[in-house]
């Protein structure tokens, strides 16, 4: 059993939890994830490790209450225990030496972006962070990112807070302002990642993307497996970041649309 040592509501439906797991905390790096099982009778939640404290022996995860396993996890409080935490799983991120980097994320991807931003800042990079949300009520960790960013932009799709629009809007402005950005990291919706990749290409900036922000619910078929790539089918758990040039966004957007259409038809059956 693994004890929850801290729980913090980031929004009405998004929660951060610190879980006591010393063996995992000792080895976890940005890009790793864990499988969290609330009890032995239900599916595990696959969650990115957003932070860890080796002194306290805790790993931090952020999740949204949206399906049965995640709702069950959200109902637990400090002092409660989960049945199982497995990890660290997956592969860690790479951090090339760069002078200036743009890191952009939407929604839950913001949580995964934090440890990446902190690592780049610790390595001496000028760190520009762009955080995107649906509306003001969904905004979280603006203060946390303020501590690891040289520049910070917050945007909402409905314009209720910060810059109106998706993350691509402030990203273009930043690219126009600076001619020395050496890397872009994006974890957002497929549409926003495609826009970001096109903008970065216009300025000849290498860009990597992550699917952390749009991982499907547990038990759903992954829409991100692309068997006809020249490499193994992508799964977010196996490759935390991938070169945007290797992603066929048009194909993935078509698969995403088909996936949600099938899901909607099944729900209405």
Language model: regions and residue ranges:
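Short, charged beta-turn/beta-strand-edge "cap" motif at the junction between a beta-strand
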Residues: 39-43, 86-92, 241-244
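Structural signal for conserved beta-strand scaffold positions within catalytic alpha/beta enzyme cores
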Residues: 6, 51, 154-156, 209, ...
């Amino acid at each position: 059993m693994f004890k929850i040592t801290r729980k913090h509501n980031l929004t009405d439906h998004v929660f951060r939890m610190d879980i006591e797991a010393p063996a995992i905390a000792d080895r976890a790096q940005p890009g790793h994830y864990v499988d969290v099982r609330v009890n032995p009778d239900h599916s595990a939640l696959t969650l990115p490790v957003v932070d860890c404290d080796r002194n306290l022996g805790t790993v931090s995860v952020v999740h949204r209450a949206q399906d049965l396993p995640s709702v069950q996890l959200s109902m637990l409080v400090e002092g409660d225990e989960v049945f199982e935490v497995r990890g660290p799983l997956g592969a860690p991120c790479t951090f090339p030496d760069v002078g200036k980097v743009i890191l952009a994320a939407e929604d839950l991807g913001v949580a995964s972006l934090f440890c990446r931003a902190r690592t780049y800042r610790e390595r001496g990079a000028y760190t520009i962070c762009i955080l995107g949300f649906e509306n003001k009520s969904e905004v979280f960790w603006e203060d946390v990112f303020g501590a690891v960013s040289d520049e910070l932009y917050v945007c909402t799709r409905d314009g209720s807070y910060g810059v109106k629009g998706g993350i691509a809007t402030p990203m273009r402005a930043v690219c126009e302002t600076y001619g020395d950005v050496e890397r872009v990291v994006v974890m957002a919706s497929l549409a926003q990642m495609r826009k970001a990749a096109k903008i970065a290409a216009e300025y000849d900036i290498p860009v990597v993307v992550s699917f952390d922000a749009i991982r499907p619910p547990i038990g759903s078929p992954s829409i991100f497996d692309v068997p006809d790539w020249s490499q193994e089918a992508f799964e977010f758990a196996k490759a935390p970041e991938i070169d945007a040039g290797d992603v066929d966004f048009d194909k993935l957007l078509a698969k995403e649309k088909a996936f949600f259409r099938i899901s909607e038809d099944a729900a209405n059956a």
